[in-house]
Amino acid sequence: MYYPDVPALDPEDIELLCNEYIAHNKHLDPHIADRLGVKRGLRNPDGTGVLAGITNVSSVIGYEKLPEGTIRPIPGRLVYRGIDIDTLAAEADKNDRFMFEEVVWLLLFGALPTQEQYARFCKLIDEHRELPKGFADDMIMNSPSPNIMNKMARSVLSMYSYDEHADDLSLPNILTQSINLIAELPTMMVNAYQLKRRVYDHESMYFHYPIAGQSTAEHILSSYRADQKFTHEEARLLDLCLLVHADHGGGNCSTFTTRVLSSSGTDTYSAIAAAIGALKGPKHGGANLMVNRQLKDILKHVENPEDDDEVREYLRRILRKQAGDGSGLIYGMGHAVYTISDPREVILKQRAKHLAYEKGFEEEYNMLCSIERLAPGIFAEEKGSSKPVCANVDLFSGLIYNMLGISEDLYTPLFAIARVPGWCAHRVEEVIFANRIIRPAYKYLGVRQKYKPIEER
């Protein structure tokens, strides 16, 4: 293992410190928070998010609030700058072209690019794929990490040292930094992964120079694969994954993190590195990996995947914490906003089928379809709730990455690459228009105590 040669903390010391903490820190009862009107998790009692700001970037729609205050479930919509992602995905299909770069422009600037603007923008991103001179050696090769998200966050922070105007908060500078990060982050990811393979997995590593004229999806596949070969359909499907993950409103954990840091007046690299750190958390960015692992477990234990009764019974056991990883969660099901459907999941499910059947993933694809179809009824029976539960984007995204031969190490990093344009768009909006530091309040519930001189303790 590649760790600094420093002495470990004594287990007895750690136990002593833990006991000290437990002795002086009482449990924070959530019922007290409810009585005080605290919006835990910045959620309203009905599960909807607290209104914390306004934005022009995107809109996440999963329900309608009726005049009496109740919620009416509706089919989900995700709207980038006034355009539904369904429309963007359909346009990509209609003209058989890559759409992510156009979505990046749309999110950053607020309108669709002209043909000339689009061509110049793609060229601009293409010309900035390479990392600054010496960066790969100094910041990546000399300090590997077993976790690619950790390495990406550190790499982004390190970019501060290569930027003469790192703290400049003017619009031209923030846009310059944003475009550079959007272009360079895929290269950082693949380089970090190759080094991880060599140092931690004891496998061969290889580095490819970016190929001119490639889309972001093509660049990722060609730089990731040893032979640099991929099919147009594979690249198009990855491009679609990037498209549907590019933004998701201002209230999700990583985007809100970006806004909180941006409101303080800090630099772009600190804000985006913090967003990567937030996305690294398994409650936010790692669900598609858990879906894949759960899918393998289900296929291992269900003798007949086409038998709905057998599948239903195993899902019931998962909910009861009698099967799976013991969490009681059916990964890929349920969402904080969407009720009837997640438009991102609908898009990926439809577009993934052909490649799944072509590459021999028919059984996996069909099982995910069965989970989507059967799980809502099981939730209703087991939880005794009429609240609608739909499949979310993670249900099929992990399978797509698996079909593309992408390592599980890169599932969440790919999410980060897709989401950087959204983070940057929200950062620009926060810096240029908000102009007020985000500062919510916490109620102190601790004890009052008098100070004792140290010689009396």
Tell me the role of every PLM-derived stretch.
Residues 1-457:
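Non-transmembrane, aqueous-exposed alpha-helical and coiled segments at domain scale
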